[in-house]
């Protein structure tokens, strides 16, 4: 085929068509009740009436993966970074009590590699399956003047729904509520500019370095996908009146736990009430970070926190265990005096 004007400008239209064909099977496995239309429509459609909600409230979220992408690019491993993208979006709207309904992705790249693009979308579809959300649309933009040939950026967008009377908003959490933490898989998708600095700039580790404290090569540890908490937490919401939910992302415990509180409340976190994953000890050691800095930046092994009444703790733990989740009582809500997050025993600064 003769090279057209667009190709001469650096945009491979044929490669774009190949991507669409390659991803169809991945999109198909995410279909759920309510989806209307087919891949390739101008707009993705979803029938809200299929949910049988009396007063539906739509909850939306958007996020990316940050500089974790640079590790995926350097390692040439692209099949799980899409899970991270989905997780960052759906876990956020779950904090409002919403069930994710559908997801859209956006990939911008310097050169469209159909195999690589398929791997990225495969990860997105895997994440959508875990979340029960349909992948109903997306965009792959080839922009050779903006990105290097091997570079790409990834962002996602999700919409969920919740019955209005079950919407979780600030104000429901009360002094005396108990905090239940659900484990993370590792670093998840925040703090990677610092992570990369610690390992590859300040200490000159190789991607596949074997570190004694870790049970997998370094890059495998750093690329572990962010956990998606949707299905187990939705089961809890069916059986327990959850007062608050926090997705522990950028800003760690210090920034995120107060987001579910009113200004007159604080949380007391019981240090030692859950196992700290080895990767955090390794980063603290090689990054020469103090304890407070770690809790200000990272999830420290807890990816989501629920606030429930004391009398609902046993039921909450029971439902989580029944759904394959380890869970820990990690603290309580108190009346605020000074700081909004208090660590029992204090932290080294």
UniProtKB/Swiss-Prot annotation:
Q: Where in the cell is it found?
A: Cytoplasm
Q: Which GO terms describe its cellular component?
A: cytosol
The record's SUPFAM superfamilies line, in alphabetical order, gives: PurM C-terminal domain-like, PurM N-terminal domain-like
Q: What is its EC number?
A: 6.3.3.1
Q: Name one GO molecular function term.
A: phosphoribosylamine-glycine ligase activity
Answer yes or no on keyword Ligase: yes
One Pfam family for this entry, by name? AIRS_C
HAMAP family listed in its UniProt record? AIRS
User: Under which name does UniProt file this protein?
Assistant: Phosphoribosylformylglycinamidine cyclo-ligase
Instruction: Tell me the classification of the organism that encodes this protein.
Output: Bacteria, Bacillati, Bacillota, Bacilli, Bacillales
């Amino acid at each position: 085929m003769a090279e057209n004007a667009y190709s001469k400008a650096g945009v491979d239209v044929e490669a774009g068509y190949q991507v669409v064909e390659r991803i169809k099977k991945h999109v198909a496995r995410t279909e759920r009740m309510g989806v209307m239309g087919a891949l390739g429509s101008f707009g993705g459609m979803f029938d809200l009436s299929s949910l049988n909600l009396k007063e539906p409230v739509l909850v939306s979220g958007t996020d990316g993966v940050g500089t974790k992408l640079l590790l995926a690019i350097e390692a040439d491993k692209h099949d799980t970074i899409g899970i991270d993208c989905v997780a960052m979006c759906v876990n956020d709207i779950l904090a409002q009590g919403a069930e994710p309904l559908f997801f859209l992705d956006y990939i911008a790249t310097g050169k469209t590699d159909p195999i690589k693009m398929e791997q990225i979308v495969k990860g997105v579809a895997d994440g959508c399956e875990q979340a029960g959300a349909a992948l109903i649309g997306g965009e792959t933009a080839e922009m050779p003047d903006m990105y290097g040939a091997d570079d790409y950026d990834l962002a996602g967008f999700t919409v969920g729904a919740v019955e209005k009377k079950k919407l979780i908003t600030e104000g429901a959490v009360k002094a005396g509520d108990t905090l239940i933490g659900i484990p993370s898989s590792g670093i998840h998708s925040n703090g990677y500019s610092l992570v990369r600095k610690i390992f590859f700039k300040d200490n000159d580790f190789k991607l596949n370095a074997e570190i004694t404290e870790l049970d997998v090569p370094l890059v495998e540890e750093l690329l572990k996908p962010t956990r998606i908490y949707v299905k187990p937490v939705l089961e809890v919401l069916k059986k327990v009146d959850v007062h608050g939910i926090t997705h522990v992302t950028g800003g760690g415990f210090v920034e995120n736990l107060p987001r579910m509180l009113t200004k007159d409340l604080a949380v007391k976190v019981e240090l030692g009430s859950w196992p700290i994953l080895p990767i955090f000890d390794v980063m603290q050691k090689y990054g020469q970070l103090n304890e407070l800095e770690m809790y200000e930046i990272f999830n420290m092994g807890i990816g989501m926190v629920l606030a429930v009444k004391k009398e609902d703790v046993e039921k909450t733990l029971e439902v989580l265990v029944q759904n394959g989740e380890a869970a820990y009582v990690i603290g309580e809500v108190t009346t605020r005096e000074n700081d909004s997050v208090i660590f029992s025993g204090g932290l080294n600064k």
